[in-house]
């Protein structure tokens, strides 16, 4: 179990450091900023690369909502759920701390929202709580459907990380303007701890919606996808 938890810790660290790091450092860099598209690709690439790197050790969840969904789908033991979630959240917090230390090393830096997730006045596009709740549930559900489908025994081995990474990229392309894209409670928690205030007050949604969506995606998959 120790190796699995370390794999989840480092995998989630890489997801937050690479994905949120691209948003903090490179998204709006003067003249050469990577924008929403670059950030979306960064998140997708972090999952793709770490799924290949450590997925064989832990399963490559890197996300409490994924762990919940896999548990509901019967692909993951419930007894391992809490340790996995703790490892994922710890990895996200350490990554956010590293990003904070690096970012504050620049004189006059304005951290803004520090890649936190939000709704209402803290949504990049000013979207409401209901909009944020729905999009996070729907996108996390489809993320789980992609994960469960691409890792099914009837699918050729070795291609799942590509499908999963591309799915996460698409998810970000859709929802960055709405919530800054969570679909991952650990990712949201790490950034919110360093923003404080409103980010912590709104954090509940980015636990509730992805977990509901993850469980819903697993149920939907079980209704039709597990049938041969």
From Swiss-Prot:
Involved in tetramerization or stability of the tetramer, annotated site positions: 20
InterPro entries: Aquaporin-like (IPR023271), Aquaporin_transptr (IPR034294), Aquaporin_Z (IPR023743), MIP (IPR000425), MIP_CS (IPR022357)
Topology in the lipid bilayer: Multi-pass membrane protein
Motif window: NPA 1: 63-65
Gene Ontology CC entries for this record: plasma membrane
Subcellular location: Cell inner membrane
This protein's UniProt keywords: Cell inner membrane, Cell membrane, Membrane, Plasmid, Repeat, Transmembrane, Transmembrane helix, Transport
Pfam families associated with the record: MIP
Family affiliation: Belongs to the MIP/aquaporin (TC 1.A.8) family.
Record remark on domains: Aquaporins contain two tandem repeats each containing three membrane-spanning domains and a pore-forming loop with the signature motif Asn-Pro-Ala (NPA).
PANTHER family named among the record's database cross-references: AQUAPORIN TRANSPORTER, MIP17260P
Annotated protein name in UniProt: Aquaporin Z 2
Organism encoding this protein: Agrobacterium fabrum (strain C58 / ATCC 33970)
């Amino acid at each position: 179990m120790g190796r699995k938890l370390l794999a989840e810790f480092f995998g989630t660290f890489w997801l937050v450091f690479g994905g949120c790091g691209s948003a903090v450092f490179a998204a709006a860099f003067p003249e050469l900023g990577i924008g929403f598209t670059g950030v979306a690709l960064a998140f997708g690439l972090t999952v793709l690369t770490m799924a290949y790197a450590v997925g064989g050790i832990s399963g490559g969840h890197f996300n409490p909502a994924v762990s919940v969904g896999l548990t509901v789908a019967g692909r993951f033991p419930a007894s391992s759920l809490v340790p996995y979630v703790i490892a994922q959240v710890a990895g996200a917090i350490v990554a956010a701390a590293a990003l904070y230390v690096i970012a504050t090393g620049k004189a006059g830096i304005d951290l803004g929202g520090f890649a936190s997730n939000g709704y209402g006045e803290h949504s990049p596009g000013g979207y409401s709580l209901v909009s944020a709740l729905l999009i996070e549930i729907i996108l996390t559900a489809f993320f789980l459907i992609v994960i469960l489908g691409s890792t099914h025994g009837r699918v050729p081995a070795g291609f799942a990380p590509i499908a999963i990474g591309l799915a996460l990229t698409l998810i970000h392309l859709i929802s960055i303007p709405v919530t800054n894209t969570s679909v991952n409670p650990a990712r949201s928690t790490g950034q919110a701890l360093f923003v404080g205030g409103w980010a912590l007050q709104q954090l509940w949604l980015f636990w509730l919606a992805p977990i509901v969506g993850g469980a819903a995606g697993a149920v939907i998959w079980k209704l039709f996808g597990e049938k041969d």
